[in-house]
From Swiss-Prot:
It comes from Methanocaldococcus jannaschii (strain ATCC 43067 / DSM 2661 / JAL-1 / JCM 10045 / NBRC 100440) (Methanococcus jannaschii). GO terms for molecular function: NADH dehydrogenase (ubiquinone) activity. NAD(+) binds at residues 152-167, 179, 243, 328. Belongs to the class-III pyridine nucleotide-disulfide oxidoreductase family. This is NADH oxidase. Its cofactor is FAD.
Length: 448
């Protein structure tokens, strides 16, 4: 029996490792276009920043490691160009242009997503970069060093865009962030919470332009400037952080059913073709709160999906649960997290909500080092928590994790307000900020 996994990101490698964990005999082959594998794309901005010393430090395993430790074959710099699902066969081409075919018993599409680059004049000039692979990160640093770059425009104010903006500022560049939406982190935070992040960026010397599309990139061979809102801004390079699109071309060739957003899968991560599975950024999933199809382009979802697919291929029953798209980011000294619905998304879906708020310190007031934290908690009209956003100096991630569990368990405002939390002056307040936000919502619910 042979399982072939196309893609060496978190989803693909987790699938391969999970199959091997539960099946010691199956032949497992991972095929990837990339030269290097098992690295963390989420860490790229932090290498740019200098918080991580080198791109080599974010590579966790080599193909040789996988062969030696797990008996998994990795074919690097190899592209799958066709899938014949009727005959369980794929066609590949290696880095030298040689074509070859392989048969499979199980096929896993872990083809990820591709950066979306808007059709802007000048997008193909030298000095325009995307941020997706370790090679992208290396190319950015090399270009800065070889060209003595002083100014950069970052297009897109999502998490990657802002993390890159801060990282490039730490490298000594003047940074301009350009965002079409009227706020930073438009898919992550409500406008009032996003304003905290924007003010922090501006305090750090990063210029932020909102509700302004990038009109064109100017230069002869290299980037020289950008046009934004009819004005010319001199820059030496442009970072395009304008989102990604699921890579579903091989799924189409295989004849897999494509849903509204990406490859359609069941809870076992099977596609419409039973022996073909799909995992990671190329699949659509179910939103826990609305029950609607959505995308979940996060490493945590990719790993969970890989475990589910791997178990099922190995004969161990497993299922993937609906998502909340819990996420966290760190930009300088600011931590930003969110899970579930925002007030904006709830209003779009016409879900009646009540909002609870709290602003507090992360440690006892008298204990040195406490950081301010601000919480916005979203409840439905039945008083069940359906979303939470937190911005602050520390300990955001663990609170978002706690709220993710609370949403899944359909915890009420009353339960959250009265929940038992731990306390010690160096690490927490006696009044847990999550409970304070729930208390605020509870008062409003009681008055309805």
């Amino acid at each position: 029996m042979r399982a072939i996994i196309i893609g060496s990101g978190a989803a693909g490698l987790t699938t391969a490792s999970t199959i091997r964990k539960y099946n010691k005999d199956m032949e497992i082959v991972v095929i990837t276009k990339e030269k290097e594998i098992a690295y963390s794309p989420c860490a790229i901005p932090y290498v740019i920043e200098g918080a991580i010393k080198s791109f080599d430090d974010i590579i966790m395993h080599t193909p040789e490691d996988y062969k030696r430790e797990r008996n998994i074959d990795i074919l690097t710099e190899t592209t799958v160009i066709d899938v014949d699902s009727k005959n369980n066969k794929i066609k590949c081409v290696d880095k030298d242009g040689n074509e070859f075919e392989m048969n499979y018993d199980y096929l896993v599409l872990a083809t990820g997503a591709e950066p979306f680059i808007p059709p802007i004049e000048g997008k193909d000039l030298d000095g325009v970069f995307k941020v997706r692979t370790i090679e992208d990160g290396r190319a950015i640093l090399k270009y800065i060093e070889e060209n003595g770059c002083k100014k950069v425009a970052v297009v897109g104010a999502g998490a990657i865009g802002l993390e890159m903006a801060y990282g490039l500022k730490c490298r000594g560049l003047d940074v301009l962030v350009v965002e079409m939406a009227p706020q930073v982190l438009p898919r992550f935070l409500d406008p009032d919470m996003a304003e905290i992040v924007q003010k922090y960026l501006e305090k750090e010397g990063i210029k932020v332009m909102l509700s302004k599309p990038l009109e064109k990139i100017v230069g002869k061979e290299k980037v020289e400037a950008v046009y934004v809102d009819g004005k010319l801004y001199d820059v030496d390079m442009v970072i395009m952080a304008t989102g990604v699109r699921p890579n579903i071309e091989l799924a189409k060739k295989a004849g897999c059913k494509i849903g509204k957003f990406a490859i359609e899968v069941n809870e076992k991560m099977q596609t419409s073709i039973p022996n073909i599975y799909a995992v990671g950024d190329c699949v659509e999933v179910i939103d826990f709160i609305t029950g609607e199809k959505t995308l979940s382009p996060f490493g945590t979802a990719a790993v969970r999906q890989g475990k589910v697919a791997g178990k099922n291929i190995a004969g161990v029953e497993a299922k993937f649960y609906p998502v909340l798209n819990s996420a966290v980011s760190k930009i300088g000294d600011l931590e930003i997290g969110g899970t579930g619905l925002t007030a904006f998304s709830a209003n779009l879906k016409r879900i009646p909500i009540v909002i609870g708020r709290a602003k507090a310190l992360t440690r006892a007031r008298y204990y040195p080092g406490g950081k301010e934290i601000e919480i916005k908690m979203i409840f439905n009209e039945d008083g069940k928590v359906v979303g939470c956003q937190i911005v602050g100096g520390e300990r955001v991630a663990e609170r978002i994790d706690a709220m993710s569990i609370a949403i899944f368990k359909k915890v009420s405002a009353e339960e959250l307000a009265n929940m038992e939390f731990c306390y010690a002056p160096p690490v927490s307040m006696v009044h847990e900020p999550l409970s304070l936000a729930a208390e605020d919502a509870l008062k409003k619910l009681s008055n309805k």
